[in-house]
Curated annotation (Swiss-Prot):
GO biological process, one term: mycotoxin biosynthetic process
General function of this protein: Acyl-CoA-dependent acyltransferase; part of the gene cluster that mediates the biosynthesis of mannosylerythritol lipids (MELs), surface-active substances that enhance the availability of water-insoluble substrates. Mannosylerythritol lipid production is responsible for hemolytic activity of Ustilago maydis.
Species whose genome carries this gene: Mycosarcoma maydis (Corn smut fungus)
Gene Ontology cellular component annotations, sorted alphabetically: peroxisome
UniProt keyword list: Acyltransferase, Peroxisome, Transferase
UniProt remark on domains: The C-terminal PTS1-type tripeptide peroxisomal targeting signal is required for the import into peroxisomes.
Primary localization: other
Applied biotechnology uses: MELs not only have high potential as eco-friendly biosurfactants due to their excellent surface activity, but also have attracted considerable recent interest because of thei runique properties, including self-assembly, anti-tumor and cell differentiation induction activities, and moisturizing and hair-repairing properties.
Matches recorded under Gene3D superfamilies: Chloramphenicol acetyltransferase-like domain (3.30.559.10), Nonribosomal peptide synthetase, condensation domain (3.30.559.30)
Pfam family membership, one: Tri3
Name the record gives this protein: Acyl-CoA-dependent acyltransferase MAC1
């Protein structure tokens, strides 16, 4: 195919010298080869493969070298409302049918949302590319083998499942054990005496193939398949995928970098500028860390064991309405107020940093899908880009030589900090060409991770005699981070496609969602999302590096700031100045 393209170029050349043409053709061939490896290509019958690109690569490498770091455990609670004429409600037969429904839906999701079935490399060689592959399963035997590895059914009250949270904690306190880090689905059945008949699903998945902006699409697909399934005896039979489902290539997960390159065709100068901006951002972390507010890991971390703890706090819908009202009154957004609260709360949780600080570094997540067309530009290429997020760091000036404890009297400090965050973040949301820097940033991250984990292993070896200064040089002060997912768009109600089934009164109600994950590093971030009008603030961290008490204090202070904002909504017009706040800032600046 490439040779044919070269011949066409040569035959059409008129005024160019042959040398110029050959040089151009060589560059074109190299570019085509490079592009091909990042798009799905068939390597054998029913086996597709591509090279990870950008943050897919660094997420996969991080997962490998850090024993499962950032693997997600995403839990939903839900119930199936049976038709009023049903006689199986509250029976073992209802649970048998529930298992059959979810098993079929999990199989269908593997074809309809292929990231569910993707396999990733597990090596830790920084010089070898990370790749992903997808095997198309056609026969009952291979599907059953995949189910045996990835689908687990538990009942509430079983050992290790006293509560759904207990099983969820199990999933994020061990790395995925499946071959190629394939994702898993846990189904927790209700007790027979549970009048609400609430079931739970936990999707345990690599962060390399999903993020907070795309995971809702998987759950929406899964639950629609659950309610559309028509279980019948024998309930352990294996679903046979349809011809449409088997035509999986158009739905395969695509790198957001490749989608960007196809849509925008960046010029060399645009790529170079993006690399420069990214380089400056990474260098700023080193330059500013010494004068920044920060989280302080325990100095005894070499002797401690890894354990992930996930904390969650919730603002009720009425509080969220008042919080939104306050944000509008001060011409800000909940994302900016919450990230400002994260910084100020870190200052008082680790006050030992205040005297030497002139402000704060803060990591913020941005979503590249804001710039990517939802419509495929090439019918042969999939439009799904399930990993579209990355992080940038901002420098926020703050007067640290005073108390920053949550208080109504210090509301102006919070609003001013939120204003600075918005101003700085806007600088990173002006052009899609920032996506050009993702491969460069990812490669830098991989090299840094490899070096850091080599140092960690050396310090933890029995023969190590490292000083406290050397230990602090490996794991030192950590900038706080904030990730705003926005609205979690998992639908609350799912009705069957079949008109007869709908008319019978059969439907599925999704009642809650919780976002947790495995943390095996010293840099905890607070995340925030809105589900059903409620805001959840969540914090996952590694007790090897951080004390549970300190992390509770950090999250609690952040939530107190949010509640103060909500309570202040009625009096803001006279209490908090909005001078110099730009009310016309672009909508896309909101995460």
């Amino acid at each position: 195919m490439i040779n044919n393209a070269l011949r066409t170029l040569i035959s059409s050349a008129t005024e160019q010298s042959l040398d110029d043409v050959l040089e151009h053709e060589f560059r074109t061939a190299v570019q085509l080869q490079q592009m091909d490896q990042f798009e799905w290509h068939q390597v054998e019958a029913d086996l597709w493969k591509r090279t990870c690109l950008g943050h897919e690569a660094s997420a996969s490498f991080n997962q490998n070298i850090a024993h499962g770091h950032t693997e997600l455990s995403l839990m939903t609670s839900w119930r199936v409302h049976q038709p009023s004429s049903s006689r199986i409600t509250g029976s073992e037969l209802e649970l048998d049918q529930l298992v059959a429904r979810v098993r079929q839906a999990w199989i269908q999701a593997r074809y309809l949302r292929p990231e569910v079935g993707v396999e990733l490399d597990t090596h830790t060689d920084p010089t070898v590319a990370q790749t992903m592959c997808y095997r198309l399963l056609r026969d009952e035997e291979s599907i059953q083998e995949w189910l045996d590895e990835t689908f687990v059914v538990k009942r509430l009250g079983d050992p290790g499942v006293a509560t759904p949270a207990e099983l969820c904690a199990y999933t994020y306190n061990r790395p995925l054990a499946t071959k190629g880090k394939k994702s898993m689905l846990y189904l927790i059945l209700p007790r027979l005496d549970d009048e609400q008949r609430t079931a739970y699903t936990i999707w345990n998945v690599s962060h390399a193939v999903t993020d907070g902006g795309s995971l809702a699409e998987v759950f929406n697909t899964l639950f629609q398949c659950v309610i559309d399934a028509t279980p019948s005896e024998p309930y352990d039979s294996i679903y046979t995928p349809s011809a449409f489902e088997l035509n999986v290539l158009p739905r395969m997960p695509r790198s957001v970098v490749m989608a960007y390159r196809q849509q925008y065709q960046p010029k060399p100068e645009e790529i170079a500028k993006a690399h420069k901006v990214a380089e400056v951002n990474m260098r700023m972390i080193t330059e500013k860390m010494g004068e920044s507010l920060a989280l302080m890991p325990s100095t005894s971390w070499p002797e401690r064991k890894h354990e992930t703890v996930c904390l969650c706090r919730e603002l009720e819908a009425n509080e969220v309405r008042e919080l939104l009202k306050f944000a509008k009154q001060v011409h800000s957004g909940i994302t900016y107020l919450a990230s400002a609260a994260t910084i100020l709360s870190a200052a008082e949780t680790f006050p030992e940093r205040k005297a030497s600080s002139k402000g704060a570094l803060v990591g913020m997540v941005r979503n590249a899908r804001r710039w990517i067309s939802a419509t495929p530009l090439d019918a042969s290429l999939g439009a799904s880009t399930p990993l579209g997020s990355d992080a940038v760091f901002l420098w926020v000036p703050i007067d640290t030589h005073k108390t920053l404890e949550p208080s109504f009297s210090r509301m102006q400090e919070l609003v001013t900090t939120a204003r600075h965050i918005r101003h700085e973040l806007d600088k990173h949301l002006t052009t899609p060409h920032c996506i050009s820097s993702y491969p460069y940033v990812a490669e830098s991250s991989i090299q840094g991770l490899n070096q850091q984990w080599s140092q960690i292993k050396a310090v933890q070896s029995p023969s190590s005699s490292s000083s406290q200064k050397e230990i602090a040089g490996i794991i030192g002060a950590q900038a706080p981070g904030f990730s705003s997912v926005g609205m979690m768009r998992i639908r609350p109600r799912f009705e069957p496609v079949s008109a007869n089934a709908r008319a019978s009164g059969l439907w599925l109600e999704r009642t809650d969602f919780t976002h947790t994950g495995r943390q095996i590093n010293a840099s905890p971030w607070i995340s925030m999302f809105n589900v059903d009008g409620r805001i959840k603030l969540q914090l996952g961290f590694d007790t090897k590096f951080h004390e549970v008490e300190k992390m509770n204090q950090w999250l609690d202070r952040t939530v107190v700031w949010m509640r103060i904002c909500a309570a202040a909504a009625a009096t803001t017009s006279t209490s908090v100045s909005s001078t110099s706040v730009d009310a016309t800032a672009p909508v896309f600046a909101r995460l």
